Curated annotation (Swiss-Prot):
Summary of the function given for this chain in its UniProt record: Component of the cytosolic Fe/S protein assembly machinery. Required for maturation of extramitochondrial Fe/S proteins. May play a role in the transfer of pre-assembled Fe/S clusters to target apoproteins.
Positions contributing to [4Fe-4S] cluster 2 binding: C209, C264, C481, C485
Segments of this protein annotated with the region Disordered: 444-465, 492-511
Family: Belongs to the NARF family.
Biological process, per Gene Ontology: iron-sulfur cluster assembly
Name of the protein in its database record: Cytosolic Fe-S cluster assembly factor NAR1
Length: 594
């Protein structure tokens, strides 16, 4: 693995597949022409041998020529096998993706290469634009010990004044449109279910995290019908930014290069997912995102530039810091970019976007508006799960539950959830879902029950506290990273712990490395908590408190769709497919199972 991302950074890690199962084929166009047109095309299907020439290049030697035609064997140069991000999306060989492919195809080297090629082009220069996530801003602000506002000014200065980007925007506009569509879809589902009497047993599962979605596609396809098809902020922002930039500059969308800075490496894979709802004429097949970098990769780019690019100059111009932040945001955005005042804002709820929280609050607002409920009659109840990465939120009206959602972070917790959603489990069914009871837990509960009976204590007074059960809620916000997106794999890690000399010589068998690991884990948890505080310092804009603005967002998006001939499905919807398991015996033998 690369120095940027390694398994040592992860505490909730599932090993990738041992072998890539994508078939290696030699395209016909790359074969020697004199054999492509032959009557038997035996060079394609006949007996061949691979040899290395004097230059170290691999050659395919046809043995059939010497056996049948008694001629000198023909040779064909072989090209290196290449794997694209699209291949990773359609391959079940790894749990999410091959990290080398992510770094190779969406790296700062590729960005710099594109910038150099554009500068050398004559009349075909590209316009470079960037979008920046809230988690990235918090990570960099923490790493450089700055406020969010100061970091935003420096980021815009880096991209616009040093790297020559035309526009820089926050991803908040895309996120708010994603939140609105996700919440409205949930509210419609809930109201429609009541109308037709449908028993909504299984929850809707979020699709914002590409790592979780790929895991479901490759290992648990039975949950795909439950996964929401609403796009993430990254993809919605990309569609908006490319169309608006192309229109303003009078160029085609293919001439706009969109870089987005995200907290997670798997966001690179999300950008490679093909569009299902693109226009049939092919004009809309331009990707919404051309390159995804993480905080770590951005810092690496700056370090390797040898002073050409500086995020934090040695002497920061005071004129830059004194600028009004609202004016800085406005000057960096396209002139036709809407809601500039909200485009760098944050949203209440989790550090992954607040999807679970926003759904409950917008549903509450819906009930107040349509059912004449009083706001003071609502309350929110939070139930903790078996660990801090699982919790449930219940919206109560006069003490009665009217809606619920949950947060599930980390692959261990995700595995527990999808097991409960697996059809056909009949052991100890509760609410239509199979729950396996640990025998040791059952015996312990039995002993506790006997103890309560003998002591005369009432069952109600000794009842255990409720534990969150995400399998029974309306909506689950799922993130592959423990602690959510604020702890994404591409975020700046905590500084390495400084070891102090021990008071006494340690025994020869002492496992000092284990101690260092424990210290690192504690430091990382504290570090992530500090980054979360930075994240929460981003000015909040609660959609549920501004229903009139929600109407404005919806109206603007509808006008955008008409003006740019972009369908609602193209702007807001994505798709998922079951990834078929390999049938090749070798791949099955060396592959991994999860």
């Amino acid at each position: 693995m690369s120095a940027i991302l390694s398994a040592d950074d992860l505490n909730d890690f599932i090993s990738p597949g041992v072998a890539c199962i994508k078939p290696v084929t030699q395209p016909k166009s790359e074969l020697n022409p004199q054999h492509v047109d032959s009557s038997s095309t035996i060079s394609e299907t006949g007996e061949v041998e691979i040899q290395i020439d004097s230059q170290g290049n691999p050659l395919e030697i046809s043995q059939i020529d010497t056996k049948i035609n008694k001629a000198d064997p023909s040779s064909t140069a072989l090209t290196p096998a290449q794997i694209s991000l699209a291949d990773c999306l359609a391959c079940s060989g790894c749990i999410t993706s091959a990290e080398e492919v992510l770094v190779a195809q969406h790296s700062h080297h590729e960005l710099l290469k594109a910038m150099e090629e554009s500068s050398l082009a004559s009349g075909t220069e590209k316009v470079f634009v960037a979008s920046i996530s809230q988690q990235l801003r918090a990570s960099l602000a923490m790493a450089y010990d700055m406020s969010i506002e100061e970091m935003d000014k420096l980021l815009i200065n880096l991209f616009v004044n040093q790297m020559g980007f035309q526009y820089v925007v926050g991803t908040s506009l895309g996120r708010k449109l994603s939140l609105i569509n996700e919440s409205q879809g949930m509210i419609h589902r809930k109201e429609e279910g009541k109308t037709i009497g449908e028993n909504l047993k299984n929850p809707v599962l979020s699709s914002i995290c590409p790592g979780w979605v790929l895991y479901a596609e490759k290992t648990h396809p039975y949950v795909l019908p439950y996964i929401s098809t609403v796009k993430s902020a990254q993809q919605i922002t990309g569609c908006l930014l490319k169309n608006l930039t192309a229109y303003e500059r009078g160029i085609g969308k293919s001439k706009v290069y969109h870089l987005t800075i995200m907290p997670c490496f798997d966001k690179k894979l999300e950008s490679a997912r093909p569009e299902l709802f693109a226009n049939h004429d092919g004009a809309d097949n331009v990707p919404d995102v051309d390159c995804v970098l993480t905080a770590r990769e951005l810092v690496t780019l700056i370090d390797e530039s040898l002073g050409k690019y500086q995020l934090v100059p040695k002497v920061i111009p005071q004129t830059l810091l004194r600028k009004d932040i609202a004016e800085v945001y406005k000057s960096a955005a396209p002139t036709n970019w809407p809601f500039v005042q909200y485009s760098w804002s944050n949203d209440p709820g989790s550090s992954s976007g607040g999807y679970a929280y926003t759904y409950l609050r917008l549903f509450q607002e819906q009930l107040i508006t349509t059912q004449n409920y009083r706001p003071e009659d609502f309350s929110m109840k939070v139930l903790q799960g078996k660990n801090t990465d699982v919790y449930e939120m219940r919206l109560l009206h006069n003490g009665n539950q009217v809606a619920s959602s949950a947060i599930v972070n980390g692959f261990r917790n995700i595995q527990n959830l999808v097991r409960k959603l697996k059809p056909g489990n009949n052991n100890n069914k509760v609410g239509g879902l199979a729950i396996k009871v640990n025998p040791l837990v059952a015996r312990r509960r039995a002993r506790m029950s006997k103890s309560e009976d003998s002591s005369g204590a009432s069952a109600s007074s000794m009842a255990p506290a409720e534990i969150a059960d995400p399998s029974k809620v309306d909506y689950v916000e799922i993130m592959a990273c423990p602690q959510g997106c604020i702890n994404g794999g591409g975020q700046i890690a905590a500084p390495a712990p400084t070891s102090t000399p021990p008071a006494a010589p340690a025994p020869a068998h002492a496992a000092t490395s284990t101690t260092d690991v424990k210290i690192a884990v504690v430091l990382n948890k504290d570090w992530v908590s500090e980054v979360l505080m930075k994240y929460n310092s981003v000015p909040m804009f609660d959609l549920s408190l501004h229903p009139e603005e929600i109407a404005g967002f919806i109206q603007w998006s509808q006008e955008f769709e008409k003006e740019f001939d972009v369908s609602e499905q193209r702007l807001f919807k994505t798709h998922f497919n079951e990834i078929e398991k390999p049938t090749d015996a070798t791949a099955i033998m060396v592959g991994s199972k999860w």
